[in-house]
Amino acid sequence: MKHKFTILSAILIVALTACCLFACNDKGDSPAKVDYQSDNSYFVKTAESETALTFEPILDPVYSESGLTYKQVDYRFGVIFYVGTAIEPKYYEYLGNALAKQGYLVVMPKVTLNMTYAYYKAQEEAFSAYPNVKFFVAGHSQGGGAALRRASENADTVAGAILLSPLCYRHKLLDADGNPVKDEESGVDKYIIDNLKDVDVATLLVEAEQDHVLSDEMKADAKTRLKEGYVHKVISPAAHMSFSTMDNDEILKSFNNDGDGITEAQKQSQRTKTVEYILNFVKGLSN
């Protein structure tokens, strides 16, 4: 009898130990929750595919011969960032890293010739790729115009819009088959002017004081497309192209003779303030 009791006790101890180990491992493997109101410091995993450059927050990365292992993060919010005209996503890495460090998944879609608005896609792939993530849509220059358009077309889906010196356009009205809709009387293609005036989308507009790329008319036009109460920040000194880290002097000279006249230190300060303004904006809406 005593022998049977000893065996039963041993079996019970083994079973309890196994359950405990399973519970511990299960807890360890479950994604870490993000407190978006805290000043976080996640590691950032950068991945590049044919369609996007992605910045993912992770924990406890371990590099070995077999590759990278890490603890997953349960990020509930993200930022889709559309690039400026002819600027590759890699030139916005500073922004992707800063946002991912705070717990946001950042996706920078790749488009033909880096012309986001010209090659605008009717469906945003990140929405279906990450169905559990609530995305802010953001962009710079032409990409800002694309972000405004995305926000207007997907107002019920996005968490907010972030526009960095946006270059806004109008585009053709298309039918369900993707064909241009024509005016019944004139036969001319109908156009849509994207705007957020009549939709409930929180919006941040950040402008560069020394912007020699956008005209005053272009800047004014962007503001007319926004709903009253949007958050507006102006950085000075700051240049249009310096929201990216691309060496831009030659590009700027094609728009104006002397470039923007902004020093490297001032460009870095502009980008630091850009990160600060965006984080303050998204953290206030990440509930």
Predicted features and spans:
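N-terminal cap/lid segment of alpha/beta-hydrolase-fold proteins
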Residues: 27-74
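Short alpha-helix in the alpha/beta-hydrolase fold that links the catalytic acid
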Residues: 95, 201, 214-224, 247
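Conserved alpha/beta-hydrolase
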Residues: 96-116
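Short beta-strand element of the alpha/beta-hydrolase
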Residues: 75-84
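Gly/Ala-rich beta-loop-alpha elbow adjacent to hydrolase catalytic centers
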Residues: 138-147
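Active-site nucleophile loop of the alpha/beta-hydrolase fold
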Residues: 111, 162-171, 208-210, 237
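C-terminal motif of bacterial Sec signal peptides marking the signal peptidase cleavage site
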Residues: 19-23
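Short beta-strand/loop motif that positions the catalytic acidic residue
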Residues: 199, 205-207
